[in-house]
Each structure stands twice: as C-alpha cells, then as structure tokens.
Amino acid sequence: MTRPRVLSGVQPTGSLHLGNWLGAIRNWVDLQRSHDTFFCVVDLHAITVPHDPKQLAADTRSTAALYLACGIDPEQATVFVQSQVPAHAELAWLLNCVTPLNWLERMIQFKEKAVKQGDNVSVGLLDYPVLMAADILLYDADQVPVGEDQKQHLELARDIAQQRINSRFGSDDKPVLKVPKPMIMKEGARVMSLTDGSAKMSKSDPNEGARINLLDPPELITKKIKRAKTDPVMGLEFGNSERPEADNLLGLYALLSGQSREQVASECAEMGWGRFKPLLAETTVEACLLYTSPSPRDRTRSRMPSSA
C-alpha cells in the first residue's frame, strides 16, 4: 500500500530553537513512520534576505545535523539540502512564467517583510512563495505540514498547480501536477517569543533572550527562562488574551512535559512566576539535553514527548 507523501523544511537562518522542534520537527518524527517523507534544508529561501554566505553554509550543515539529532531517521525519511537539487530553481522559473504578479503582491508575509526592508526588498523575497510552490509540487506531495503563518503560501501553491498548470496544460483525468493538501498541526504549531508573548519565536530575532536554541547549555536556558517576560498577576491561566506570556509559557510546559493543557492548568493555577519558572526551566533543560545524547533514534523513540 502506497503511503501518502509529505514534504516540509526549515530555513537555515540560525540555530534551530524550541519553536522549530515543537512546531515542526517533533511532528516530522512521527510522520516518517506512517508517510513517505521528504525533509529539506531550504537554503535557497534563506538568501532572499541579507545574509553572510559563510555563516549560511555553516548553518545549513548544522540544521541538517540537528534534523538527525532530533530523531529524523535517514532510513525512514529522505533528508536533503534544497540548493543541491537544481530542479527546485528550474521548476520555480517555469511557475514564475504562469503566476500573476498580483497573486504575490497580496502575500501577507511579503508585505510585512517589505515594510522592514524598505528600498532593499528583493525580487527574491517577493518570489519566495513561488519557490515554495516548486519545492512542494516537484515531489508530488500529498500533504504539507504548515503553521498558520505559511498556510497562505500553500494555498498559492494549490492555486498555481490547479488554475495555472492543470487547467491549461492537463485534463481532469490527467493532471500535470498533484494538488497538495495542508496538514495543520494544532499542538505546538506556533511557539511564541520569551520576550513578547504576541510574537512568534524566531531565529532572526536580534534578541537572543527571545528564544531557546536546541543547543543552548542548561545554564543559559535557565537564565533565559528566568528573564522571560511575565506579568504581575498571581495565578497562572490559559486563554486570557490580556496575558499572552502566561499562555505561551504554560503552553511550553505542557508540550515539554507531555501533559495536557487541562492538567497543566490544574497544576499551576495557584502558582506564582517565582515557583513556575524553575519548574519550566528544569523541564526545558531535560528536553533539550536529548539532543546531546549519543543515540538519537533510541532517544527520540523512548524519551521525546509524543505529539499525539
């Protein structure tokens, strides 16, 4: 029986952090056992913004190594670097020739990044979603794990495949390209910054204290959590829009400890930050130490909290 094919990837724009693991890679580890999986280090996407070539090369190697350290098994999944497969860029050019410009101009991420870069914004940044479409369509992916921030880009890939390629060059019974479906991961799909509970944890954030890198030493993890932004309200709770930091840190604890949000809410309802932060730090350190143990496959299968 043919297994459904899945493709996903992460940009090597810095060290992988908890958001990358909880939002993506942890789910990949489960998917590789039930799907035909392709996991890519998307270095061509990383050059759409200012970068240091030598650092990008080092980060590309580091990202690939961390894929394996996190439990991606080369015997179960295909792991590769995007730029090493010329067909990605070749298909992107073909798709460029049929994609309307106004489709790209309405992409939310482009609008946000263009404001930050001003006159330095590149054509590559505008064209980023077409390259992403090529990444997906090249491998006939059935499903693509995406967070909410990438959902619009996947919809563009679907539109390009169906409206601009299949309807013009194929037929109902013989489509040229497979139209992929989104796989939205609910749990851990969007891990927020330690310094701003309303902003996504990001490798590009200039404040190192905003994220926990997978290779941070225990003392640095503890320091970052101790300094994480909180509020003066006693008692911890989920779902209060006026307390985004509480929601984020409690959510991290739930994901890293393997407990449900209901269990964590009950456990921490009467806690103050002074008691909760050491608990979160200890749990986070234990999780991140998984990446330095000698046997990634055994480590992942026996100790990593399940994403189910």
Regions found by a protein language model. Give the residues of each.
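Active-site cores that bind ATP or allylic diphosphates and position pyrophosphate for catalysis
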Residues: 111-282
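Hydrophobic helix-cap positions at the C-terminus of alpha-helices
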Residues: 28-31, 164, 299
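Glycine/threonine-rich helix-loop capping motifs at alpha-helix boundaries
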Residues: 162, 288-289
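Proline-centered helix-kink/hinge sites
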Residues: 12, 129, 145, 294-296
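N-terminal Rossmann-like or analogous alpha/beta NTP/dinucleotide-binding catalytic cores
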Residues: 2-7, 12-134, 283, 288
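Conserved small/polar residues in nucleotide/adenosyl-binding loops
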Residues: 291-300, 308
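Generic detector of well-ordered alpha-helical packing
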Residues: 44, 136, 150, 296-299
